């Protein structure tokens, strides 16, 4: 089990924290968001010696060993990518709107990305994953292409990785598989414990309200 972090004297490369081995992120000039996404979007660059990787967001805890057994079985089936279906949405365009209405992204960052998707002819309701739990054969050539393109779009447009993944599945003609059956997500699975993010400070809440207000004024692009 590996945890990727920026360079730190307190947790040097190769040190252990419980079952986790600390590995430094090989990205020199990234901000906190980019550092956190590097290993997630580009596992083939940091785990070349392994055939399969499992990405788990820091707000998820596996609480039943049966899940490990199920994952081993799924990996043995030979599929290249497993994810978890979004519990509510099935469309990048709808998720973009939600990001704007909840101040998770700014209109100026989302607008060019949506314009790009529309000019590409990307369809509505093509699908959506949560992206907080991913199992993939990251060294497979098609998965490498998807992940490299994923990082490129993430770096070019908004820092919301959900707004580009299913476009890449569509672009590459790739069909991922589900970790859980339809209707089961990280929020209701008995195998996982979902930990809500920390409460925002008053200053951050005010800032987000201003961003939300600005976004609402500019939402015509998504209509």
Locations of regions flagged by a protein language model:
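Glycosyltransferase catalytic domains, chiefly GT-A lineage
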Residues: 1-223
């Amino acid at each position: 089990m590996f945890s990727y972090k920026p360079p730190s004297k307190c947790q040097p490369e190769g040190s252990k924290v419980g079952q986790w081995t600390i590995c430094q992120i090989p990205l020199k000039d990234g901000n906190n968001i980019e550092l956190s996404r590097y290993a997630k979007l580009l596992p083939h660059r940091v785990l070349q010696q392994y055939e399969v990787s499992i990405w788990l967001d820091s707000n998820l805890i596996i609480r039943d060993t049966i899940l490990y057994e199920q994952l081993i079985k799924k990996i043995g089936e030979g599929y290249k990518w497993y994810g978890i279906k979004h519990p509510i949405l099935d469309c990048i365009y709808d998720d973009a709107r939600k990001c704007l209405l909840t101040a998770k992204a700014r209109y100026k960052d989302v607008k060019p990305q949506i314009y790009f998707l529309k000019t590409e002819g990307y369809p509505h309701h093509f699908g959506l994953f949560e992206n907080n739990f991913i199992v993939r054969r990251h060294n497979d050539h098609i998965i490498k292409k998807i992940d490299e393109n994923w990082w490129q779009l993430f770096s070019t447009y908004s820092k919301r990785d959900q707004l580009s993944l299913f476009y890449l599945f569509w672009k590459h003609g790739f069909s991922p598989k589900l970790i859980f059956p339809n209707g089961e997500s990280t929020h209701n699975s008995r195998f996982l414990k979902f930990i809500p993010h920390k409460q925002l400070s008053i200053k951050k809440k005010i800032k987000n309200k201003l961003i939300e207000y600005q976004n609402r004024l500019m939402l015509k692009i998504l209509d």
